[in-house]
């Protein structure tokens, strides 16, 4: 079954979520579980209601967020005011929540990154999005299914997707042309095969600028159609152990990574946080890099026409791999403050944020996917794809994936990602073999 469900699938119960009895009882009394408890009554007078929204969007993305919040505050006729508060990194928001309590959470709506999903489900703090959807009769088919799949457990959507991205391959078309390469490689094997030509004929200082990033490791398991962890990738029940060691997936990834590094096709450029891989690419040193679809605008801006940027699907490990990609980014979680008027106001604001018009604007400004399918029909969206045809790659890759490649849910995902990155680094630095690195990952997570 796991071979079939590959990178996802499954259902959950409050027991499997790992919630303690107290948490489960508390959240049930507060009407905040998806397991048949009383949902909020959305038929409320929201005049004069103020809700607090915590988010982690800085820079250009932060400006786009402020624009949407201000637009809602000016245009909504329900007397609702949204106070948006920038929290810094996603980790900071989760840490701030840890000291909160039901009924007094400090915020009504929070933006939490993908790998915080299991933690939030288990917390007992939330009003599952499905309850608001059901109470309002909202048509959930409007949400892009491959995006919704990540945040869906036991057919319940727990949070509303908002800023979603997948990784893609970026390449320097001029270098490829100079090297006489007409076909863009679709696998790491394929990149290894053209590495020398990119250097000797294409003039690349490094063929592939590859950041050490746990997100890529997770994607390459999905690309092989293999699970990260047991219990249906932590979706049938809380994961108790990793499976990437026993199913061979991790070793395939590390062997391919080491081969690229040994051949000097992908030298060590450090971890993703350093941005070295991106700057190596935009400065014309690297022929290829991997990065988020949400980096497209920044990359094009930094290249500034000095060469033509091409985009392609995120590569597989081997040519025959047939898995898909999983979603990154973040989603919106409604917090339970035992206040139906605030819940109703929060839901109205969420509906505004995911409206086709808002999503087309958000996509054009940030490069994140529109999470609402109808956004594709908005002129803003069409104009943006016409201006940046590279973005079509991201849309096609998303549509070509399947909900079963939604990816794993782990309560310790942030820590697990750090461990994976440390062990890949150890391997690249020659401190351990790929086999030993996989063993170390599995024993620590």
Tell what function each PLM region has:
Residues 30-45, 113-168, 192, 220-223, ...:
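Hinge/lid segment of periplasmic solute-binding proteins
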Residues 41-44, 130-143, 227-252, 301-304, ...:
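Short, solvent-exposed loop/beta-turn-alpha elements that line the ligand-binding surface or hinge
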Residues 71, 75-143, 174-186, 280, ...:
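Extracytoplasmic "Venus flytrap"/periplasmic binding protein-like
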Residues 74-75, 81, 179, 255, ...:
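Extracytoplasmic/periplasmic substrate-recognition and gating elements
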Residues 99-100, 108, 136-175, 206-210, ...:
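A structural signal for short loop-to-beta-strand junctions that line the ligand-binding cleft
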Residues 115-125, 130, 146-183, 210-237, ...:
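Periplasmic solute-binding protein
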Residues 195-196, 239-270:
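Glycine-centered hinge/linker elements that transmit conformational signals in sensory
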Residues 325-326, 375-376, 390-444:
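C-terminal capping/gating helix-and-loop segments adjacent to ligand/active sites or protein-protein/ligand interfaces
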